[in-house]
Amino acid sequence: MLPVLSHWGWSSLIHDAFEANRGVVFPPALYWPEGQDSRVKETMTGLLTIHVRRGDFTTHCKFLASWNSDWNAFNSFPGLPDKYDQVYSDPRLSSENYEAYMDHCYPSTEQIIEKVKTVREESREPLEYIYIMTNGANSWVENLKVALHDLGGWEHIGSNQDLSLTWEQKFVAQAVDMLVAQRAQVFIGNGVS
């Protein structure tokens, strides 16, 4: 195995940022033994993490659709549940295909809620905590949190906008999100980010 795969790990800057903010991800007293370091590579039981790009994706998804872009890297693994078939779903061929592409790349709040509900119902183990990774406007994130809360059953809902980061940690905020996503029990992304 390549050393970059077998010896790779997050820097102390990332771990320190996570440790300082673990209460944003899920309530500190639950499922995370006191003193257990985030460097331990265990799954965060009960955590659902969603990645919902906004901002630049307003136009970027339209470009991706016009190029008939496939899912990125790990998102294209055959074992993952959501598939994108470039041959039969080319968004350049019809408005229906274009809309289907955009549903994945830039879903509405209602589509996000429906996907979360479905994933939660199909999960073998209960999902009680949700962490939202996004570059969306604060007001949009707060509205999404309210909509998720209205589903009921969440012990905790947090987002990367709730993180309290030091000056240097702000430059690696996306890596903190990636650590959380990597360790979540379930991760929902959009396939192209």
Predicted feature locations:
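Conserved blade-ending motifs and adjacent loop-strand segments that build the rim/top face
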Residues: D162-V172
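Core catalytic architecture of nucleotide-activated donor-dependent transferases building glycoconjugates
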Residues: M1-S164
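A donor-sugar binding/catalytic signature common to diverse glycosyltransferases
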Residues: Q174-S193
